[in-house]
């Protein structure tokens, strides 16, 4: 287990996700009342779309190994493992990893999954992966480049990432809501993201707009 060197901001974010882990996971399980499920489908449609996008790319590219950076409660990890992939999930929120381990055990894929409690910036590993994904991650990163540079070293072939778009109606709402909860949040222009990816050593293959998100497929250069 690596020694963590959390900044005050990353500690705030980890504490936020620890506190809401079961509530967040319920977005995927649907274990909510009828009204809440309906609101999720309406207001968080792109969360389901980004999941489908990653699985579609995985089915096309068929990676043998995947690293999920900011894996949260393990929904992507478990679904990728069901496809026969060896998956490593990295997250710095302990309660999220507890849920992720429970999920992979309950779905019978734990033997193909492992988890690391760490900020990817602090993770000490010699491993690399056919595909790396970072979904629902860049919302909470003030300076993407250092983490992108680490991710580039982890990536043999393909990197998939989803970035919240600047200038949307949801941006203002999320800023207010998350500030009240003590969690910083960030939004991005497409050109900014392209520049960061290129600086880190990736070549952008495609960018799809899914609701409030930019979803980038990039290749290691």
Question: Where are the regions that the model predicts?
Answer:
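Short conserved loop adjoining the S-adenosyl-L-methionine
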Residues: 122-127
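Conserved class I S-adenosyl-L-methionine
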Residues: 2-60
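A short SAM/SAH-binding and catalytic strip from SAM-dependent methyltransferases
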Residues: 131-142
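Conserved beta-strand signature within the Rossmann-like core of class I S-adenosyl-L-methionine
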Residues: 156-164
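A short, conserved alpha-helix within the catalytic core of class I
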Residues: 141-151
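Short alpha-helix
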Residues: 184-200
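Class I SAM-dependent methyltransferase SAM/SAH-binding core
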Residues: 67, 73-120
């Amino acid at each position: 287990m690596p020694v963590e060197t959390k900044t005050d901001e990353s500690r705030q974010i980890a504490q936020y996700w620890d506190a809401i882990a079961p509530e967040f996971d319920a977005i995927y399980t649907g274990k909510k009342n009828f009204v809440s499920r309906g609101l999720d489908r309406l207001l968080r449609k792109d969360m389901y779309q980004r999941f489908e996008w990653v699985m579609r790319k995985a089915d096309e590219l068929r990676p043998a190994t995947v690293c999920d950076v900011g894996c949260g409660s393990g929904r992507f990890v478990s679904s990728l493992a069901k496809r026969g992939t060896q998956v490593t999930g990295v997250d710095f929120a302990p309660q999220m990893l507890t849920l992720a381990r429970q999920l992979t055990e309950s779905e019978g894929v734990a033997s193909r999954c492992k988890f690391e409690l760490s900020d990817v910036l602090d993770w000490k590993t010699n491993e690399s992966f056919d595909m790396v994904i970072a979904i629902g991650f860049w919302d909470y990163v003030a300076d993407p480049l250092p983490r992108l540079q680490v991710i580039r070293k982890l990536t043999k072939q393909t990197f998939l990432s989803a970035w919240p778009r600047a200038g949307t109606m949801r941006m203002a709402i999320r800023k207010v809501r998350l500030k009240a909860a003590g969690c910083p949040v960030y939004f991005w222009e497409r050109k900014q993201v392209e520049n960061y990816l290129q600086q880190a050593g990736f070549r952008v293959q495609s960018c799809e707009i899914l609701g409030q998100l930019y979803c980038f497929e990039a290749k290691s250069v």
